[in-house]
Amino acid sequence: GNNGNNPSSEIKLELSETHLFASSDAITKTVALTANADWSIDQNFTESEWAWCSVTPTYGSAGTTTLTVDIQANGYDKRIHDFSIRSGDTDILLTIEQKQVVYFL
């Protein structure tokens, strides 16, 4: 028994980018997720919230997966949202930050 200190048993969960910035326009961005075990994404929107961004796919297995982040056009308030990506006991966040519409008079 190596008391669970075997490095091969550690969860690896990495994003090519952890914080995406978007202008107020609708846009689709992609992020690479690399994992060595099954993973899933919690969109973290409650039923009463407007889900202004989404990530697909929401689950997968070991390897590198391209996540597609769809961001809808924004109004007059800057907004930010965290998606939780979980594999085993490991959790990482993907943060989406979107600028508000700016009027030039």
Residues of each region from the PLM?
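Short strand-edge motifs at loop-to-beta-strand transitions and within beta-strands
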Residues: 29-31, 65-69
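Surface-exposed binding patches on compact interaction domains or structured appendages
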Residues: 10-15, 36-66
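Short, solvent-exposed loop/linker segments at the N-terminal edge
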Residues: 20-25
